């Protein structure tokens, strides 16, 4: 498809998405509970649920939530959900409020380590690409640094490098000494030098041209765009290119896609055809990434699976 047709199909896809069935009583219960807590996260989730409850469409089959998604809201081309949304709620909260229709399973599919591997592919960082094809890049980084850091700490550090997060901020976020953050960053620098070099060069090219371009998207920059946003632009825009192709491939496979959440996809599968449809959905996402990355395949995992409780 050419770009205009693909964007048009994506807009049509968004308009035709199924609504998401939720448990209104469970949401109301959690609004009451979370709003009484001091935790900022709990307060935030309560506010999101309040907005969702107000927008629910209720009929004889249940309570339905339809996200309002903007296609042209971000400079990188990623879809953006307007207003209160499930996207903004941490995914570990979802199971308690989703209510799949009878005979259905809600499944959340997730690209594994998408952003660092997009960067590794473009930079041809052979070490990360090899580790990824063999297993988990973060576990390999743990081994590289002699087990001094946890997998999550190594993940946060690598992602932080891609986003240009400073040492002090990372130290506070990870709860470790600044000197240890610097030491880990030094080890990462030796490992991902091709990525650092590629992203810096990409940002310089964007600045010189005055615009950034991916397969589907073009963004004209201004003096307000900082170097860090330009450095990360190609990764985010490529993720958006993959997302759009995944949406269309799921449509072609007759798999209802209900919601995208960055690099995750909430789909509805039929219990009677569960494994076949799960395989088809996984293949659709794998193929979408390969379409964008010239055959390089991102791995897909099932992050959440929620069958209907109705008999």
Regions found by a protein language model. Give the residues of each.
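Short, solvent-exposed polar/charged micro-motifs at secondary-structure junctions
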Residues: 78, 116-117, 268-270, 308-311
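Helical (often loop-to-helix) elements that flank the catalytic cores of nucleotide-handling enzymes
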Residues: 180-185, 272-293
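Catalytic palm subdomain of template-directed nucleic-acid polymerases
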Residues: 168-170, 174, 266-282
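Acidic, glycine-rich two-metal-ion catalytic cores of nucleic acid-processing enzymes
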Residues: 1-145, 208-264, 278-285
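Short beta->alpha junction loops/turns
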Residues: 111-112, 163, 177, 270-271
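Short alpha-helix boundary/capping elements
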Residues: 126, 162-166, 269
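Conserved catalytic core of nucleic-acid polymerases
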Residues: 143-260, 297-311
């Amino acid at each position: 498809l050419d770009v205009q047709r693909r964007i048009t199909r994506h807009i049509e896809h968004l308009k035709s998405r199924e609504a998401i069935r939720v448990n209104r009583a469970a949401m109301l219960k959690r609004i009451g509970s979370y709003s009484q807590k001091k935790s900022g996260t709990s307060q935030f989730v309560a506010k999101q649920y309040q907005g969702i409850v107000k927008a629910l469409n209720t009929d004889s089959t249940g309570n339905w939530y339809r996200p309002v998604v903007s296609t042209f809201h971000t400079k990188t081309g990623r879809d953006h959900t307007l207003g209160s949304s499930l996207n903004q709620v941490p995914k570990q909260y979802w199971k308690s409020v989703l209510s799949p229709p009878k005979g259905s399973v809600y499944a959340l599919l997730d690209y594994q380590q998408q952003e660092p591997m997009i960067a590794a592919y473009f930079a041809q960082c052979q070490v990360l690409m090899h580790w990824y094809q063999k297993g988990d890049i973060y576990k390999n980084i743990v081994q590289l640094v002699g087990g001094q850091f946890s997998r999550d700490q190594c993940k946060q550090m690598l992602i932080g490098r891609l986003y240009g997060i400073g040492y002090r901020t990372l130290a506070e976020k990870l709860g470790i000494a600044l000197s240890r953050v610097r030491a880990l960053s030094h080890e990462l620098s030796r490992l991902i030098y091709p990525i650092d070099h590629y992203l810096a060069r990409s940002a310089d090219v964007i600045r010189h041209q005055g615009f950034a371009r991916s397969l589907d998207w073009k963004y004209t920059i201004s003096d307000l765009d900082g170097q860090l946003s330009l450095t990360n632009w190609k990764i985010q825009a490529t993720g958006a290119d993959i997302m759009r192709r995944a949406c269309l491939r799921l449509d072609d496979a007759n798999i209802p896609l209900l919601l995208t959440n960055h690099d995750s996809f909430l789909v509805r599968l039929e219990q009677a055809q569960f494994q076949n449809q799960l395989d088809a959905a996984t293949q659709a996402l794998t193929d979408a990434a390969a379409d964008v990355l010239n055959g390089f395949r991102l791995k897909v995992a099932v992050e959440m699976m929620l069958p209907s409780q109705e008999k």
